[in-house]
A protein has these predicted regions:
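Polytopic transmembrane helical bundles with strong interfacial aromatic enrichment
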Residues: 1-143
């Protein structure tokens, strides 16, 4: 990559890879976003199976989306720090496909949430599975 963008990306990669505090901060933000977003989503997914019916706070979705925003930004920063490794990694692309599936499932889940029933349970089960598979893929990327 050449030009100003290439120079900026190379500068970021140098800073990220050579500065432990920067690397740690970005990695922490990524893990914290997954923990908060995934934890809240898993809690809501579990509530969908309650015999009393789902009691899901509508503000929960904003928290999950905010956490996903943190994951997106920190993930982009990690990607830009090592483009060659990530862009050629099958695990990375599988993880990205899982993230797209999670977002699509979340869209459907929000639409069926008020009705409850079998579709809420299905999207909740899929959500829990996708969050855990994304975590597994992310773990495979860093090990």
């Amino acid at each position: 990559m050449s030009g100003a963008l290439g120079t900026a990306i190379a500068g970021w990669a140098h800073l990220y890879n050579d500065n432990h505090a920067v690397n740690t901060t970005v990695t922490f933000a990524h893990f914290a976003g997954v923990l908060v977003g995934g934890g809240l989503a898993l809690s809501a997914d579990r509530a969908a199976f309650s015999p009393l019916g789902p009691a899901i706070d509508p503000r929960l979705h904003r928290w999950v989306l905010g956490a996903l925003g943190v994951v997106f930004v920190s993930g982009m920063l990690m990607l830009l720090a090592d483009l060659q490794t990530y862009l050629t990694s099958a695990v990375f692309w599988i993880k990205m496909a899982l993230v797209v599936a999670l977002l699509a499932n979340g869209y459907v889940r929000v639409r069926v949430e008020a009705r409850g029933g079998v579709w809420l349970r299905r999207t909740s089960a899929l959500s829990a599975s996708l969050w855990l598979l994304i975590l597994l893929a992310g773990t495979m990327l860093v090990s």
